[in-house]
Amino acid sequence: MLTYPNINPIAFSLGPLKVHWYGLMYLIGFVGAWLLGYWRIKHYKLNWNNDQLSDLIFYSALGVILGGRVGYMLFYDFQEFIHHPWVLFKIWEGGMSFHGGLLGVVIAAWLFCRKYGKTFLEVGDFVAPLVPLGLAAGRLGNFINGELWGRVTDVPWGMIYPHVDDQPRHPSQLYEFGLEGVALFILIWCYASKPRQQGRVSALFLMGYAICRLIAESFRQPDSQLGFVAFGWLTMGQVLSIPMLLIGIWLWWAKR
C-alpha cells in the first residue's frame, strides 16, 4: 500500500502573498492552452491570429474560474453557499466544478463569437484539443490538495490518506489525470490533426470527457455533503456528465 505524501498546498510565498499549487495549476493550464493553440495556428495554417487566440484564452479563463466556482457551489455545496456565501471567493481552497466551468466557457465562447464573427462550432473545434492538458493540471492540483480521494480498495496501489482515515483508497485524482488529461488529450489531439467536418472535434470531446468521467467517478468517493444523488449509485459528477454524452452523440450523428 502507498501513503499520501502530504504535499504542502502552498508552492511558495512572496512576502505576505502565498501562491497555492492549485492556483498555479490553473495558470499552467491556461498558458499551456495558449502555447498549444499558437502551435496549431502556425502548423495547420488556421484562420486565426494571435490576438484572437489571446482573447479566446482570456475569455475562457474567466469562464472557467467564474463558472467553475459558481457551479461547484450550486451543484455540490449549495447549503454551504446559502449559509456562508463568502466561501464563493475562496478559490484557493479548491472546490471547482468542471461542468460549471464548461458552462462558463460556453458563455465566454458565445461572447467571443459575437466579437469576431466566428461560428460556435468553429471555436469549439479549435479549443477542444487545448482543454485536456488543463484538466490534467487541475487534477494534479486536486491530488496536491489531498481532496477528491477514492473509495476504499484492496488493490496493491491503494493509497492511505492520513488526513481522511487509515483505509487504503483509490488515488482517483490520478485516475482522472490519466483519463481526462493524458488519454483524452492524445485522442482529441490526434483526431484534430486532420481536417474534420465542423462540429466533429467538439462532439468527440464531449463524448470522450463524459465517458472518462463516468468511469473515473466509479472509483471516487462521493462528496460527503451529497453522497450518491440517484439510484443509490450515481454521483453528481456522473449525473452532470450524462447530458454531455448525449449532446456529444447527437452532434456526432448530426455532423456525420
From Swiss-Prot:
The keyword Cell cycle does not apply. The keyword Transmembrane helix applies. InterPro entries: Lgt. Its EC number is 2.5.1.145. GO terms for biological process: lipoprotein biosynthetic process. Pathway: Protein modification; lipoprotein biosynthesis (diacylglyceryl transfer). Its main location: membrane. It is found in: Cell inner membrane. It is a multi-pass membrane protein. It is an enzyme of class 2 (transferase). Keywords: Cell inner membrane, Cell membrane, Membrane, Transferase, Transmembrane, Transmembrane helix. GO terms for cellular component: plasma membrane. A 1,2-diacyl-sn-glycero-3-phospho-(1'-sn-glycerol) binds at residue 139. It comes from the Bacteria. The chain crosses the membrane at residues 19-39, 56-76, 91-111, 231-251. One of its GO terms (molecular function) is phosphatidylglycerol-prolipoprotein diacylglyceryl transferase activity. Belongs to the Lgt family. PANTHER family: PHOSPHATIDYLGLYCEROL--PROLIPOPROTEIN DIACYLGLYCERYL TRANSFERASE, PROLIPOPROTEIN DIACYLGLYCERYL TRANSFERASE. Catalyzes the transfer of the diacylglyceryl group from phosphatidylglycerol to the sulfhydryl group of the N-terminal cysteine of a prolipoprotein, the first step in the formation of mature lipoproteins. This is Phosphatidylglycerol--prolipoprotein diacylglyceryl transferase. It comes from Legionella pneumophila subsp. pneumophila (strain Philadelphia 1 / ATCC 33152 / DSM 7513).
